[in-house]
Amino acid sequence: TRGATEGIYQSRGHYQQGMSCTGAARYVNQTGGILLRKDYGSIDLSTYNSSLGARHKIPNSIYKDEASKHQVKTISNIRAVEEARDALANGYSLSVCSGYGFSSVRDKNGVAKRSKGWSHAMAWIACDDSQEVYNETLFLVQNSWGKWNSGPKRLGQPDGSFWIREKDARGMLSGGGAWVFSDVDGFPARKIEWTIDEVF
């Protein structure tokens, strides 16, 4: 079952674009939770509709009561690359809000250079701490824009993703907008089975 993001957008408290990852974390952890991508009867969330959350059209019986059935019990603010690396190694991706923007063209190693800034949230989905490319830890960032960038890829990275260098990762994390989520009601933890040989 997929999650529906409209409730998170409704939690912003304003009708304009954008929000903070801190506000989103607070909603899924304290005042609401995660809504499911389905028809709730009084409101249909089976198909994404940005205006529902943006215009505060989700009734409280859904926005608060139904969402709280799938509340995130643990949220952690990540501020160091070591914390980000450890979270990813344990199967937790990060939601990172920052003003950092990156090139739409990856280099020969799948890395995107920092470019003009944008205020945006992106998922960090993997880490390469082998230090084989730039003698530093790299983080794999997945953007939500579909196949928006081009260039070589490495280690099976998905379309729309790019690796970032450690110095950029440190800068993004220093703003305090990076979060890891765990222990969600209704979604039991899954055992991760892998060996170091499967990673390389």
List where the protein language model places each region.
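Acidic helix-start/capping segments at beta-turn-to-alpha-helix junctions
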Residues: 1-11
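Predominantly the structural core of cysteine protease catalytic domains
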Residues: 9-142, 147, 151-200
